[in-house]
C-alpha cells in the first residue's frame, strides 16, 4: 500500500513523495528527485520510516552519488523511448530509527488515500460530464 503523504511534526509540515507500509510493520519512505538542483535544494528529504530511498534517473544518480547518505537506498528509473520503463534498486538502504510513530504514519497514509480518492472521483466526474456533452452535440 503506498500513496504520497504529508507528515506534521511539532515544528513543521513535510511531504514525503511516497510512503509504503509492508504487512511486516516496516515503513519505507521515497523521495523522487527529477533534477540535480531538486536533489540539492533546501527542501527537506523526508525519510520518516524504517528505510529511506531516493528515486532518480541514471544521469542524476551519477552526479549526486557521493552526496547520498550511507543509510539511504536508491532506485533508478529507466524510461527508454517507446517503452513503459522499469526501475532497479542499485543501492540498498540500512534500517534507520523511525522518526514518528506507526500510528502517525498510518494516519498520514489514510489521509493521503482519501485525498487521492477525492481527486480520482473529481476527474471521473469531469470525464463523464465531457462525454455527456459530446453525446448531446450529436
Task: Please give the residue ranges for each predicted region.
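Generic preference for well-ordered secondary structure
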Residues: 14-16, 36, 58, 93
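Extended interaction regions within the primary functional domain
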Residues: 6, 40-44, 94-99
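A short acidic/basic microdomain associated with nuclease active sites
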Residues: 1-11
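Acidic/polar N-terminal loop/beta-strand segments that form early-domain functional surfaces
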Residues: 5-6, 21, 32-35
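Active-site beta-strand-loop-beta-strand hairpin of nuclease catalytic cores
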Residues: 11-29
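Residues in well-ordered beta-strands of folded domains
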Residues: 3-4, 19, 75
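Non-catalytic C-terminal interaction segments of nucleic acid-processing enzymes
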Residues: 10, 65-138
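Catalytic cores of nucleic-acid endonucleases
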Residues: 27, 31-79
Amino acid at each position: 500500500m503506498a500513496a504520497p503523504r504529508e507528515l506534521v511534526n511539532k515544528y513543521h509540515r513535510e511531504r514525503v513523495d511516497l510512503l509504503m507500509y509492508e504487512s511486516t510493520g516496516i515503513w519505507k519512505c521515497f523521495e523522487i528527485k527529477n533534477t540535480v538542483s531538486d536533489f540539492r535544494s533546501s527542501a527537506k528529504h523526508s525519510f520518516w520510516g524504517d528505510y529511506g530511498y531516493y528515486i532518480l534517473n541514471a544521469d542524476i544518480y551519477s552526479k549526486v552519488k557521493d552526496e547520498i547518505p550511507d543509510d539511504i537506498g536508491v532506485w533508478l528509473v529507466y524510461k527508454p523511448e517507446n517503452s513503459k520503463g522499469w526501475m532497479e534498486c542499485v543501492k540498498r538502504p540500512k534500517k534507520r530509527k523511525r522518526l514518528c510513530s506507526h500510528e502517525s504514519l498510518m494516519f498520514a497514509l489514510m489521509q493521503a488515500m482519501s485525498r487521492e480518492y477525492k481527486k480520482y472521483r473529481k476527474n471521473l466526474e469531469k470525464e463523464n460530464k465531457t462525454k455527456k456533452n459530446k453525446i448531446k452535440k450529436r
